[in-house]
């Protein structure tokens, strides 16, 4: 089992958007919701929480966490992802979060493995199965063997067969699997039994 240490925030430069915002997009900025503006401007910050092996006490890697703008009610991940669910933007926020965590992990040249949070909803989404995450980390020069897909338990799932199939796909590409907070949340023992993760993380 692996335990999470207190969160550390690293100094980092802001990464530019994937493509330059057009003038027309700028004109429409005022009509966006705060969450849409966060997505458009990539106003998310990555934090990294050290992960230790409970058996040996040795450092293993980091869990990548995400925060909204510090001056926004959406700074808290609970508020950020809650708003995303209400506005049907969960996939967009999670994918952007993943990209920023990966970019920052590489930029800071952090050692060890990166535990990357993935919700069951996103794991089962067709767009998550097309290799975009693998392509993205390869462009960053990061090996998939250093990335652990950490299944979050912030929402229930009962499609265990679908999750097994999806995780077989990612294991075949070199990723490992972790479950967050075994013993808490929904059906965690069933999830462990069905998915057989390489890691169990305890906060």
Label each region the model flagged.
Residues 1-23:
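Cyclic-dinucleotide signaling modules
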Residues 20-83:
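Active-site core of bacterial EAL-family cyclic-dinucleotide phosphodiesterase domains
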Residues 47-49, 65, 115-119, 150-152, ...:
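A cross-family glycoside hydrolase active-site/sugar-binding cleft signature
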Residues 70, 83-88, 118-123:
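Conserved protein-kinase N-lobe ATP-binding Lys motif
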Residues 70-74, 98, 181:
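Short acidic-capped amphipathic helix/loop micro-motif used as an active-site/signal-coupling element
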Residues 91-162:
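Catalytic core of bacterial c-di-GMP phosphodiesterases, primarily the EAL and HD-GYP domains
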Residues 137-203:
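The catalytic core of metal-dependent phosphodiesterases that act on cyclic dinucleotides
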């Amino acid at each position: 089992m692996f335990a999470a240490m207190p969160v550390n925030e690293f100094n980092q430069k802001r990464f530019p958007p994937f493509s330059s915002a057009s003038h027309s997009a700028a004109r429409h900025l005022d009509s966006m919701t705060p969450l849409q503006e966060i997505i458009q401007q990539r106003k998310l910050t990555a934090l990294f929480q050290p992960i230790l092996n409970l058996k040996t006490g040795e450092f293993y890697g980091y869990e990548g966490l995400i925060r909204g703008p510090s001056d926004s009610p959406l700074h808290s991940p609970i508020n950020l992802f809650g708003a995303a669910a209400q506005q049907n933007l969960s996939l967009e926020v999670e994918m952007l979060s993943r990209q920023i965590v990966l970019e920052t992990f590489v930029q800071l040249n952090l050692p060890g493995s990166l535990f990357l949070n993935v919700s069951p909803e996103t794991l089962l989404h067709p767009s998550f199965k097309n290799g975009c995450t693998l392509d993205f980390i390869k462009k960053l020069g990061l090996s998939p063997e250093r990335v652990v897909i950490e299944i979050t338990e912030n929402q229930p799932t009962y499609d265990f067969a679908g999750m097994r199939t999806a995780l077989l796909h990612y294991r075949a590409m070199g990723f490992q699997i972790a479950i967050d907070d075994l013993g808490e949340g929904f059906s965690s023992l069933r999830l462990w039994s069905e998915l057989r993760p390489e890691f169990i993380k305890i906060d």
